[in-house]
C-alpha cells in the first residue's frame, strides 16, 4: 500500500477532510458557547389585539428566564422554553422565537376566567381548570372535575334563560348523582334535578312574577323537579 501513490493520496485526502470537518465542528461548538451570545432581552406580549398582559407580569417572566431557561441565543431549547412559560399560572398557551442577536419573543394566550373552582383554582371559558386565584366577582362551580366542561356549557344555558328576569347565576352545583342545583345572585336556590333542565328553568322564568306576587315576598327556594309544577318557599 505504501508504494501505491494513488492509495496514499486518497488516504491523505480523507484525513485532510476529516481534520477539516473536525475543525469546523469544534469552531461551531466554540462559537455557539461564546459568552458573547447571552440572552439579554425577553419581549413578552399577549396574543390579544392590544398585546397587553392582564395577569402575567414581566417580573414573573424575568424570574422564570433566570431560573429555568438555560442556554444562550443559539443553544436555547425553544420547545423547553415554551413549556416553561406555560407553567406560569395564568398562561394557557405560549410560543417562543429568537430575536437576533440576543433576545426572545414570547407570545402568550392568557386564561380568561369564568368561574371559581374550589378555593385555589379557576375555570376558563374553554372549560379548563387552572391553579390561580382572583378577586373578580365570578360564579362558583362545584362538581366532579371531569364534568367541568359540561358545567361551563350549562352555566351559559342557565344564564341565557334567566335573562328575562335579570337574575344572575352565582353558583352551579352538580352532585355525584348528576343532580343540578343553581343559586342565584339574589340568594334564591333552584333545584333542577337530573333531567329536563331547560324545560324546568323555563317554567320558573315564565311563572316567577306570578308566584312572587302571590307570596308577596322574594323566593328563597324553588324545587323544580316536579312533572308539571314546582314547590316554592318565600324568604319569610
UniProtKB/Swiss-Prot annotation:
Essential cell division protein. May link together the upstream cell division proteins, which are predominantly cytoplasmic, with the downstream cell division proteins, which are predominantly periplasmic. May control correct divisome assembly. The keyword Cell cycle applies. It is a single-pass type II membrane protein. Keywords: Cell cycle, Cell division, Cell inner membrane, Cell membrane, Membrane, Transmembrane, Transmembrane helix. It comes from Nitrosospira multiformis (strain ATCC 25196 / NCIMB 11849 / C 71). Residues 38-236 are periplasmic. It is found in: Cell inner membrane. Gene3D superfamilies: Cell division protein FtsQ/DivIB (3.40.50.11690), membrane protein fhac (3.10.20.310). This is Cell division protein FtsQ. Part of a complex composed of FtsB, FtsL and FtsQ. Residues 37-111 form the POTRA domain. One of its GO terms (cellular component) is plasma membrane.
Amino acid at each position: 500500500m505504501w508504494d501505491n501513490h494513488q492509495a496514499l493520496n486518497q488516504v491523505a485526502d480523507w484525513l485532510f477532510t476529516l481534520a477539516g470537518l473536525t475543525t469546523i465542528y469544534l469552531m461551531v461548538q466554540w462559537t455557539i458557547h461564546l459568552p458573547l451570545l447571552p440572552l439579554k432581552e425577553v419581549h413578552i406580549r399577549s396574543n390579544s389585539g392590544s398585546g397587553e398582559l392582564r395577569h402575567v407580569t414581566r417580573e414573573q417572566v424575568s424570574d422564570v428566564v433566570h431560573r429555568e431557561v438555560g442556554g444562550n441565543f443559539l443553544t436555547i431549547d425553544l420547545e423547553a422554553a415554551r413549556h416553561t412559560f406555560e407553567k406560569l399560572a395564568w398562561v394557557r398557551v405560549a410560543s417562543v422565537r429568537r430575536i437576533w442577536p440576543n433576545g426572545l419573543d414570547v407570545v402568550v394566550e392568557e386564561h380568561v376566567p369564568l368561574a371559581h373552582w374550589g378555593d385555589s383554582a379557576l375555570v376558563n371559558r374553554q372549560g379548563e381548570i387552572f391553579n390561580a386565584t382572583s378577586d373578580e366577582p365570578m360564579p362558583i362551580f362545584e362538581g366532579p372535575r371531569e364534568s367541568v366542561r359540561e358545567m361551563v356549557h350549562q352555566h351559559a344555558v342557565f344564564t341565557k334563560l334567566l335573562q328575562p328576569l335579570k337574575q344572575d347565576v352565582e353558583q352551579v352545583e352538580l352532585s355525584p348523582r348528576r343532580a343540578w342545583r343553581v343559586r342565584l345572585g339574589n340568594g334564591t336556590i333552584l333545584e333542577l334535578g337530573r333531567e329536563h333542565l331547560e324545560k324546568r328553568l323555563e317554567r320558573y322564568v315564565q311563572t316567577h312574577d306570578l308566584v312572587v306576587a302571590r307570596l308577596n315576598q322574594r323566593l328563597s327556594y324553588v324545587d323544580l323537579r316536579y312533572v308539571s309544577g314546582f314547590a316554592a318557599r318565600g324568604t319569610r
